[in-house]
Each structure stands twice: as structure tokens, then as C-alpha cells.
From Swiss-Prot:
Pathway named in the protein's UniProt entry: Purine metabolism; IMP biosynthesis via de novo pathway; 5-amino-1-(5-phospho-D-ribosyl)imidazole from N(2)-formyl-N(1)-(5-phospho-D-ribosyl)glycinamide: step 2/2
Gene Ontology annotations for the cellular component aspect, listed alphabetically: cytosol
Gene Ontology annotations of biological process type: 'de novo' IMP biosynthetic process; adenine biosynthetic process
Main location: cytoplasm
Catalytic reaction list: 2-formamido-N(1)-(5-O-phospho-beta-D-ribosyl)acetamidine + ATP = 5-amino-1-(5-phospho-beta-D-ribosyl)imidazole + ADP + phosphate + H(+)
Alphabetized UniProt keyword annotations: ATP-binding, Cytoplasm, Ligase, Nucleotide-binding, Purine biosynthesis
Similarity section: Belongs to the AIR synthase family.
Protein name stated in the entry: Phosphoribosylformylglycinamidine cyclo-ligase
Keyword Zinc-finger: no
Gene behind the chain: purM
Length: 351
């Protein structure tokens, strides 16, 4: 069978002609290696660039249980594209996964990321990965690998998507699953740094309606910077707290807000009653509620409303927990208590 004939003057095609620049990918790897190197920790075997990433579970664990979590940044990325601001979304990516595995008592060990785009901009991608590495440093886990996918025609120019996953370990006997939570326990709320990475489809709709000047001053910084503030990472202060106090349950306040995330750690028959006057609603959430005409119930169901992590401890341990977390740099409030559920009542109510 004869091969098909090409046009007389046609030149051979390359991958670059198809929109994939292998050299740009190699340049990115060279740029991000120093960022990843700063995240190295005990357990990492080998460096970036292998087919698989190797990690040895620390010997301090007698019966280690691996805990994994995966997530993205959601439509917060659309705002990042609009603002051409790419230095914070990497921390968002890490925070969403490490905070999730933390709630079961896990120490984050390593993280891998996936960066997908239509055309690779090396500087933009490097800025994003630098943020990922900074998030890994804040959570004490190693950035041990990742994937950069340049896929022509899949994404609009200047846009990309992010995904990542974290793996951690917890001693089998110390898994936190909420099973010891009882009536009378106290719910502590740790302050969020802002909107974090959930609810941005509604945020963008409010911005579209209000049409604000995003560069205008908003309580000492631009409104854009307030909206894009990276998700707070709670790993180090909470791991330290677990060494001193019996933490009974934790809830990372993500999509679904306080009212849908706290029930995930409560046994049937228990309700967390939260006092919305126990902590201040940050100005950014007031702005969103006012300009979007968003009802209180919807705010609590969509946004973190100033609380990024809920921690449940016994009443006897509550003051010590607040003191320790405050000393570690966290803002903490006693935001509620656990009680028996009333018939037909939700497992988290805000009063």
C-alpha cells in the first residue's frame, strides 16, 4: 500500500505547528524546580521529573492510615484571568485539599498538581506553581510532582484550569471522625482570610450586577485583592493543638457554608447551634450581601461568612484551645455548642 501523497510544496508538520510547545514545557520545569525544592521534607525519595513520585511514610507512625483529598479552585480562576492575577490561586489549590484531610487528623505529606491550558504561558504557569509551592510550605507537605497539559483548542487564550491532590497520614488510633462528639461540646470558629475558594459563581454575578471599581480601596487594600485573598491554611496550628488537646471533630467550611459542612462530622441526633453574633461578619461579606441582596440563610449556605474552619472540643478544653490557637496566630471565637436535635431540625442551625 503506497503512502498518501502530500501537496508538492507542503512542508512536514511538527508538534509546535499543532500548538504544543515542548520547549516551553521544558522551560517551565526548569523554572519551577527551585520552588519545589523548597518544599522538600523527610520522606521524599528522588526529585521532580520521574515517571512517578516516591515518598516513604515517616517511621514515627506505628499504624499509619493514608488520607487523601483532591480539589480545584473553581470559578475563582475566572476572576484571576480578568484581573491577570495568578500569584494566589496556587495557595488556594493546596489549601482546599490539605485543610480537607486535616479534619480527620492527618498530617499532609505530599501534594501533586495538574495545570491544563490551551497555550502554555511559561511565566504565568510558573507564577501559579510558585503559589502552589508556597501553600505546600505553609502546610509542611512536599510538592513532589505534577502535570502540565498544553491542549490547543481546549481552553480560551489566557485561561487555564487547576486541580491537585494531597496525601497525608494519621495514626490509626488517632483518626478524628466525630464519633466522640457529645452534648455540651463547644464549637470553635477559626477566622477565614476572605471568601476562600467557594461561592465565586455568585461573587462574579454580584460583581456583574454592581459593576464596582475593583481597584478602589476596600478597608486598606484594593477590592480585587480582598476578593482574591488566598485560602487560609490551618494545618500547622491545628496539628500542634491535637498534640495537647482531644480535638473531637473539625469541619473545613467550603461549599455549603457552615450549615452544610458542620453536620458532616456530627452523629445523628446531635445539632450544632451557632450564634451568629458570636463573631463579626467581615466587611467583604457585608459588601457581597448588600450588593447582591443575598438573604442571611443563603449567605450561610454559600459562603464561610468569616469562619474557615470549625473545631469541636469539650467544654473543659475550650478555653485552652482558644488560648493555644490565638498564640499560634489564629483568630478564634466560641461560635456555638452541641446539643440534642429537636424533631425535624437540621444538624446545624444559626440563631
Amino acid at each position: 500500500m503506497n503512502p498518501p501523497k502530500s501537496a508538492p510544496d507542503a512542508q512536514g508538520l511538527s508538534y509546535r505547528d499543532a500548538g504544543v510547545d515542548i520547549d516551553a514545557g521544558d522551560a517551565l520545569v526548569d523554572k519551577i524546580k527551585p520552588f519545589a525544592k523548597k518544599t522538600l521534607r523527610d520522606g521524599v525519595l528522588g526529585g521532580i521529573g520521574g515517571f512517578g513520585a516516591l515518598f516513604e511514610v515517616p517511621k514515627k507512625y506505628k499504624e499509619p492510615v493514608l488520607v487523601s483529598g483532591t480539589d480545584g479552585v473553581g470559578t475563582k480562576l475566572k476572576l484571576a484571568f480578568h484581573l491577570n492575577k495568578h500569584d494566589t490561586v496556587g495557595q488556594d489549590l493546596v489549601a482546599m485539599s490539605v485543610n480537607d484531610i486535616l479534619v480527620q487528623g492527618a498530617e499532609p505529606l505530599f501534594f501533586l498538581d495538574y495545570f491544563a491550558c490551551g497555550k502554555l504561558d511559561v511565566d504565568t504557569a510558573a507564577t501559579v506553581v510558585k503559589g502552589i509551592a508556597q501553600g505546600c510550605e505553609l502546610s509542611g507537605c512536599a510538592l513532589i510532582g505534577g502535570e502540565t497539559a498544553e491542549m490547543p483548542g481546549m481552553y480560551p487564550d489566557g485561561e487555564y484550569d487547576l486541580a491537585g491532590f494531597a496525601v497525608g497520614a494519621v495514626e490509626k488510633s488517632k483518626i478524628i471522625d466525630g464519633s466522640t462528639i457529645a452534648e455540651g461540646d463547644v464549637v470553635l470558629g477559626l477566622a477565614s482570610s476572605g471568601i476562600h475558594s467557594n461561592g465565586f459563581s455568585l461573587v462574579r454575578k454580584i460583581i456583574e450586577r454592581a459593576n464596582p471599581d475593583l481597584s478602589a480601596d476596600f478597608h486598606g487594600r484594593s477590592l480585587a485583592d480582598a476578593l482574591m485573598a488566598p485560602t487560609r491554611i490551618y494545618v500547622k496550628p491545628l496539628l500542634a493543638l491535637m498534640q495537647k488537646i482531644a480535638v473531637k471533630g473539625m469541619a473545613h467550611i467550603t461549599g455549603g457554608g457552615l450549615v452544610e459542612n458542620i453536620p458532616r462530622v456530627l452523629r445523628e441526633g446531635l445539632t450544632a447551634e451557632l450564634d451568629q453574633k458570636a463573631w463579626p461578619l467581615p466587611p467583604l461579606f457585608k459588601w457581597l450581601q448588600e450588593h447582591g441582596g443575598v438573604a442571611d440563610a443563603e449567605m450561610h449556605r454559600v459562603f464561610n461568612c468569616g469562619i474557615g474552619m470549625a473545631v469541636i472540643v469539650s467544654a473543659a478544653d475550650a478555653d485552652a484551645a482558644v488560648s493555644d490557637l490565638t498564640a499560634a496566630g489564629e483568630q478564634v471565637w466560641k461560635i456555638g455548642t452541641v446539643r440534642a436535635s429537636r424533631e425535624g431540625e437540621a444538624q446545624t442551625v444559626v440563631v
